A protein has these predicted regions:
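A structural signal for small-residue-enriched, beta-sheet-centric alpha/beta enzyme cores
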Residues: 1-88, 92, 98-404
Length: 404
């Protein structure tokens, strides 16, 4: 497996683009994006667990019932959520995109992100859909990634190549996500493309299994968005034998999927609103994977610990506190905690109790822009990893005037 450039355009037969259509006030910001497959593709998606769902979620769920899609369209600046005509507008987006590209509107993945509770006018979208389609190109992944950004400060794009059945395949993705990130079943907005041949059923299984260990293990602020969705299209143009069972080829595909989604998870967590550090919690020695996940997620969700990481304060007691209310079955008298970064590692807790350590060395480690909290439970062989970020003054500033 090899990391390559191209994002969602790395896979054969995929093109993408993004333009400004007028949803957002700033004319310098793209606010609508499109991804197109040359041929109909196997498709799957997972969605937010929030009971309040954006209208595009319902439309996409219906469109993907048959496991086939050929185009994805997404606007930013307006979530199209809690609007009386929301589903009608989302379906109109499908029709407009389908007409422009000559594609069945029922084969369109539609998404929106932005402010909740504001009507989304179809007029600017209708007026610019032709221009959006004209902007789609074979190297347009970056423009598409820009078009789905809201409070993001970094573009999130990744791709890999891998070999299945002797054929070189490609899998790439773009994502948006900076705030309201605390998913369950899906997260933020993620668009994945692949040229491997895989059945809709196996693609759905691969994605559903994958998000449990990747996107479901990310949290920035504890808020679960109304519009979270991860979607994938696989068009088969790599020419490999169809993956229709859990065989060796399926395992290779899943490994490539995990490589891409894990990279996107780290990008999303590192770009948390106002964040200055990527916070990763690695839990090992757990009785079960479930306990390991509960423990890791609890640690990266702790506001007190996130604030301590921002201040480069080695307050390991906040780690134990988070473990204690995590719901995981642990024996605190066996727990070890260490902090780790590019400049080194330091043990700060052994067997659930304090030990002597250099505060200066700990601070040096915690001042790096990527920090790991390593928790060893000494109770079994299961492990899990979760990703988050520190909590800074800027998070409040950004969300205090989000609508203005």
């Amino acid at each position: 497996m090899e990391h390559i450039s191209g994002g969602v355009c790395a896979a054969k037969g995929f093109q993408a683009g993004g333009i400004h259509c007028g949803i957002r006030k700033n004319r310098g910001k793209r606010d609508i994006s499109m991804i197109i497959s040359e041929v109909p593709a196997s498709a799957a998606a997972v969605y937010t667990s929030n009971l309040v769902k954006g209208a595009p979620i319902y439309v996409t769920q219906r469109n993907l019932a048959g496991g086939i899609a050929q185009l994805a369209v997404c606007n930013s600046g307006n979530a199209n959520t809690c609007n009386a005509d929301g589903e009608e507008v989302a379906w109109q987006m499908c029709e407009l995109a389908g007409k422009a590209a000559g594609i069945d509107p029922h084969h369109v993945i539609v998404a929106s992100t932005g402010v909740i509770g504001q009507p989304l006018s179809i007029e600017p979208i209708a007026q610019h859909m032709g221009a959006l389609y004209a902007a789609v190109k074979g190297n347009g992944s970056q423009e598409a990634a820009e078009g789905i950004m809201t409070t993001d400060t970094r573009l999130k794009e990744v791709a890999v190549s891998f070999v299945v059945d002797g054929k070189v395949c490609h899998l790439g993705g773009i994502a948006k996500g900076s705030g309201m990130i605390h998913p369950n079943l899906a997260t933020m907005l993620v668009f994945l493309t692949c040229d491997a041949a895989i059945s809709p059923a196996m693609l759905r299984k691969a994605l559903s299994d994958n998000v449990k260990d990747t996107f479901n293990m990310v949290s920035v602020d504890g808020d679960t968005s109304t519009n979270d969705m991860v979607s994938i299209m696989a068009n088969g143009l790599a020419g490999n034998a169809l993956i229709d069972s859990e065989n060796v080829d399926y395992a290779v595909f899943c490994a490539a999927l995990n490589e891409v989604t894990t990279a996107l998870c780290r990008m999303i967590a590192k770009d948390g609103e106002g964040a200055s550090r990527l916070l990763t919690c690695v839990v090992t020695g757990s009785k079960t994977v479930r306990d390991a996940k509960l423990a890791a997620k609890s640690v990266i969700c702790s506001s007190l610990l996130k604030a301590a990481i921002f201040g480069a304060d080695a307050n390991w007691g906040r780690v134990l506190c988070a473990l204690g209310y995590s719901g995981a079955e642990i024996d605190v008298k066996k727990v070890d905690v260490a902090f780790r970064s590019a400049v080194g590692s330091i043990d700060v807790c052994k067997n659930g109790a304090s030990i002597d350590f250099s505060e200066e060395k700990a601070k040096e480690i915690l001042l790096e822009d990527e920090v790991d909290v390593v928790v060893t439970l000494h109770d079994g062989n299961a492990s899990a990893t979760a990703w988050g970020c520190d909590l800074t003054y800027d998070y409040v500033k950004i969300n205090g005037d989000y609508r203005s």
